[in-house]
Amino acid sequence: MPKNRFLSVLLATFLGMLFPGCECGIVPIVRRLIGKGVPPYAGIAFMLTGPIINPVVLFATYVAFGSSMHMVWYRSIVAIIVAIIVGIILSFMFKEHQLRDDHFPEVNNKRPLRKKMWDVCTHAVEEFFSMGKYLVLGALIAAAVQTFVQTSTLLAIGQGPFSSSAVMMGLAYILSLCSEADAFIASSFQSTFSTASLVAFLVYGPMVDIKNMFMMLATFKTKFVIVVIVTVTLVVYASSLLIYAMGW
């Protein structure tokens, strides 16, 4: 990674285009990248765009909105802007690593191939049990909220330009949808909500939802996670209001 913080954030942001992935699995990847020396602010920039601007998600968005590129461009541009802003802010606020556990075993590249393959399998199992419990817990809470909080209640209060974006962001957080599928849900709200609020839904959900919040809390220090969530929330909300004001 470049030593310049701005170039580092910029590079990490666009790396998300090359690695198709879901927000469910992006946190462990970022944890390992930071453990190998990637600056935390660059890791977060990658974490924010990885589940959004990769080809699989963009194609799903294209199909969900009737083979239209408009929402693909809105979603991509806003996600990139949010990731860059958040990454730069974090680079000034946090100088040291923010991992809860920064111990990573040293890798010996001289071992036999069979041993290396065994280590890969062992590592995969360890990561599954390390982060899987938080994924399951987050999914359980999301399911409970979906069961007891009626979606119609949120939709009823989300008709104004300010409240609609907030409601759709809240809905994205609660539903905790996979980024490959959320566009199909968002498209069903086209007749009810503005384009700006739909963009907020499509950008905010993959960045912050119940599942990945628990995984972030298990991986990073609490203060760092709070700053990330608050900053992402404010920037996404402001971006959606700007889209609304410009009449896009």
Where are these regions (language model features)?
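Membrane-interfacial helix-loop-helix
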Residues: M1-L18, M117, S152-A156, V236
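Short amphipathic alpha-helical coupling elements at transmembrane boundaries
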Residues: M1-P2, P28-G35, D119-E126, A156
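Juxtamembrane loop-helix boundary motifs flanking transmembrane segments in multi-pass membrane proteins
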Residues: P2, F6, G35, F65, ...
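Detector for Asparagine
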Residues: N4, N54, N108-N109, N212
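Membrane-interfacial helix-loop connectors
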Residues: G16-I77, Q150-F224
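Selected transmembrane alpha-helices and immediately adjacent juxtamembrane segments
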Residues: W73-M169, I226-G247
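Hydrophobic alpha-helical transmembrane segments in multi-pass integral membrane proteins
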Residues: E180, I185, A200, Y237-W248
